[in-house]
Every structure is written in C-alpha cells, then in structure tokens.
C-alpha cells in the first residue's frame, strides 16, 4: 500500500514548473504517515522508500510507530538504511515488524537540511516470508562458518518452536544487523559538527579569548621504536594545537632504531616547548612514562601514546573546561580511532564519571589529563602493570578524589591509531594488558578494603565482571509482587524464583489487588503454606506506587525487591548479584537485564530524555548484543532502571519516601530513581541478573481514553518536576540522540556550542 505523507514540522511544500517537492528547514523534519482506515495491523511488513534528492543530503531517515497499547517505555524507532544520499534518485528497502496494531506512524526523512521528493509504501508479509527475507539479508552479510551457524540455528528454531520462534529469533539478529549498518554515518557527522579544516579550526579559536587563566599542559609521551611516519604525525598533532601553552615531554625508552631519537631531536631543535630524554636502558612503558614526567613543569599532565594524535582543539577544550570547573583535578575526553590513511571511525562517546563502568572497562583512557600534583602524590606510574599502566594510574588517582573532582569533556579530542600490533586495531592484540588490568583492579580493591573479586568475561579481552561479596548471614530480601488474577503468570513468576534462586534469605510477598478468579484464590491458599511466601490484600484502585509503598510498610526485610508478576527468572545468581550491589553503601537502586520471551532485550537500563522523559536502552536487540562499546554487557551506573525488577536497601527506599503515589502507572520508577540519585546515591544496572519480562500481561495496556489521559498527565508531571535535568543524563553522552534510537548520533549534538 502506498502511503500519504502529511508534513508536521520543519517541512515546506515547494513547487516549480516540473514538480512539487519538500524542503527540510531543520534537523528534525517529520511527516505524519496517513494510514488506511486510521490504523495498521501489527505484523511483518516490507517498507519501500524512494527519495529524489534535489539539493543537500538525505541522511538517517527513521520510522516511528505508535501502538494501540501505548508502548511508552520503549518508544520504538525503525532506522531506514539510507546514508548521505545526494543528488538523484535513491531507493531502499527494509523489513519492519510492528509489535501491535499501529495507530499512527511518523516518518522523519533526514537529519540534515535538504530538498527532496519521497514515496513510502508498506507490503504485509507472513511469518515464513518474513523469515525468508531476514535470513537472506543476514546470510548475505556473513561468510563461511558464520553462515553455517546461522542456518543451523534457524533450522533448530523452526523445529523446536515453529515459524513464530524462527521469525522472532531472526528478527533479533536482523534488528542488530540493521543498527550496525544503518547508524548515522560518522563521516557525515564529523563533516557537520567536527570541522578540522583550517577554516573550521579558525572559527573554533574564537573561543580562546574567553580564557582568563592559561595553565600549562605537560604532554607526557614515551617512545620505543616508533615508526617515524607515525612519530612525526603524533608530534605534529601537538605542534598544531590551537592552545599554545604546552610542553611535550618525550622519554625514549632506549629505542634500537636510531632514527627515532634523531627524529625527536629534530623537533627539539625546532620548538623550545619540546623536551626529551633518552633512557640508557629499556624499562618498558611505565618506567619511560615516569622519565617523561620528570621533565614536566606544567600544572597539568596529559598522556599521549607515541603513534596516536591529538585533535587540533584538544588542549583548548581542556583548558576551557578546567576554567569552568575549578574543582576538577582529573579529566577525560571522548576518543575515536584513525587508520593509516587518516580516516576516523569508531568513536567512543563516553559517560560522565561512571565508577562502576570504570571497574568493568577503562572508560577513561584517552585523552586523560591529571593535575600534576596529583600524579606526584600517587607516585606516577607503577612498573609491573605495563599494558594497563594508565588504568592503574587512574584507579590510584580516583581513590584520592571526590566525584565532582573528576571531569569529562564530551568531545572527540584524541585519535587512537589503528596499526599492526595496536589494541586500537584489535583489543586482543596485547593479552598481557588484559591480565595487567585484572591485577590493577585487584590491587585497587586491596587498597580500598573492598570485598570483591575480578572475573574474566570469556571471549572479551579488557572487560570484567566485578563480583562483590555479600555478608554472612545474608540479609533478608523482601520481594514485593503486585498482582490481580492471571494466576498463570504469577505461578510462573513464583515457581521460577523458588526453583532458580540461589540467594539464601528471601521472602515473597504477593500484594493482591482485588483478584476474583477462583483459580487465583485457590493458588493463594496453597502458596501461603510455604514458609517464605505470604499474600497481603490491597483493596484499593490500582496504583503501582501505592501498592508497593504499602508492601514496604508491612514488611521488614533489609532489602526490598520490586517485581512485576510477569517476571520469570533465568539465571540462578540473579538475586545474589543484585543484592551484592544494593548492600554497597554508595549504591541506590539496582536494575537487571530483562528480555522479552523471544530473547530480545526489553530493558538494559533507562536513559533520561529519550522520547521526552525516559526510554529503555537497546530494546529489541538480541540476547548477547554488546551495545555501544560493550555497555549492554557491563555493570554500570545509570540514572534510572525499571521497577519491573529492581532491588534497593530499605533505608534508601524510606529515606526518599518510597514511590510517588501521584504517579499511578507511568514513570514512577524513573521519578524514584532520580530522587535516589539526587539524594547522593549511585543507581546501578547489571547484565549479570537476567530475567524474562512478559510485559503488562496482567494489568493490561494503556489503550483506553482514560488510561491514555492518565499517562499524559503523569508524563507532564515528571517533565514539570525534573525539567531540564531529563535532557542532561550524565550517563548518556550529549553526542547521542534523544529523538532517535538510543546510542545513535545526535543531529546536532546537544553540546555543540560549548
């Protein structure tokens, strides 16, 4: 069916003698797609898009379905694989799956200004046809053993679960493939928002007069047998800095290749800001770095590897950030990779200071800048940690700092060179670094008296699971489960807890909100004979916040677990993992990894600002999907998590007054988590607690006028309470979009003017 497009924002209808076309006047133009009969049934469809670009570029088109049940928490975006389309006709096809009946459809044609015509159509497919389409696309993207594994797994899914299971599983992989191939192209993004041309740099330099203080940066660079080509490129990137109060401190680690020292000396003769020392014997990177630090006279020390490069504005942005944030004693920036041809790729847009993520991966790394006095306080680099010497340094530095003394500049200011032997090219290149990092983290736990151990993650070099010990005896956990009938779901939930939970001390408290079915009431009678289960009646209109607050008041467990009745436990260690974090005094609310029954992600943490208030990360991606820089597989601090499965110490719950009973259904968990965060605790999400979430199956969907009106009131309430804070999630980089899928590039970035 061909679809009619009606402009809603940032679009002008234009015409000339030959045709009628559209002009996108901003970076967020959108159409309302007019659906036959006002809605479209859920299911599988092939989408065809034909655009004729007349002027400018079409980049990153996206389709946004709105569902009849108010799928609010997971506002879905379906990227269309069209990147940097310039003058001429462009056609593209992708498969889409509407998870329920679609009541409205929004089409955003481009994130860039342009003039164009567009035709959009949908054709419905059956499950088998959809599976065939996805399998064909996925096989074309694989080769060899990868194709064999995909075919075998698909055949197994078909045999064990029929066409539906096969299509569901394929869709998870297809969604991940679509994201990998359709994400906004970094080249286009840097063209618009990171102009390193002479003209672009000249414009950026206009901010230099803002600087009142001009601290000196001592750039510490150890060298050893560096290919001269990359050594020159590295030093040139320092010499080209727009900010001029720097010194480059080079320590050559007794390179056998004489041209390395000759090259360094040629730069020393040319620029008095370059200082160098040649070590008599090779001592490896930590010792060489310390030799370079001995040359430093600046207030701040920045770390630079001998074959990498600084962005021309790196020191300028660091100086501006330090002036605006005088408490900072340490800062880190975003980074990307650069190949031998100078092409940039794979940006790492980082979270602000994220202590738990930092223990799972070195999310500080490049560019790291430290107050020189701090480096001297901790004794510089420690030998014996080569390959992870910068991680060990950062661990020891942060032990002496308050969180507000650790800053993040959300700009790509460091380019990590991808050459043979570099971990930028392949993280497994230096396996010794993997084990050095483990030792560094273990040493950190010894120094801080933290009862935790570092566990490797099989198949992932440089990423770790931190397992915290729980006290003996284990504190009592009260699991609160609100329910109304749907005994099938409740039985599945409780059975899975009893059969698959290794944590030794918990009680299950069912909060009955007016169940009437005889099967449910009979089940209640049977389960109350279990010593760890009781049923509390709650005879009032449904209010998720009020029900759980009531349950908390009527129980005494040191730890409170909030669980929906449609949750099903997967891994036996789920509660031990969550409680081990919740018992840490600095931690507030702890969330889990939740999957839909088809093994796609339903919840991998909540990002503030997505869709206006908040949204889930990585919705619809297959189980095992790594996410941006493996963040979907690592424990980390986040601003919020879903209360469908959350754990929190009773003292924290009570300190903030529990859930806000003015929020009956929507966003009560987001509001609760923000209040906990504002009270000084860090919320945390762990992928090592895995459960299924058969979402909203008991309460029903937000599909009536009254429910929709209530949802809008609650949305407005949260927006009014938290305001601009919702668009400034410290754990979500401002270079990522709030309007498209989480962790895709923002057009423009929200920090463009800073």
What residue ranges belong to the model's regions?
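N-proximal low-complexity "stem/linker" segments adjacent to membrane-targeting elements
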Residues: 164, 168-239, 442-446, 450-499
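Acidic donor-binding segment of Leloir-type glycosyltransferases
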Residues: 239-278, 498-537
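Glycine-rich, basic loop-to-helix element that forms the pyrophosphate-binding segment
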Residues: 279-296, 317, 538-555
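Short aromatic/hydrophobic "clamp" motif used to bind/position activated sugar donors
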Residues: 301, 560
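Conserved donor NDP-sugar-binding/catalytic core segment of glycosyltransferases
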Residues: 313-345, 419, 567-613
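Short, flexible, basic/aromatic active-site loop/helix in glycosyltransferases
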Residues: 343-363, 592, 609-639
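A short, conserved alpha-helix in the catalytic core of glycosyltransferases
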Residues: 374, 384-412, 441, 574-578, ...
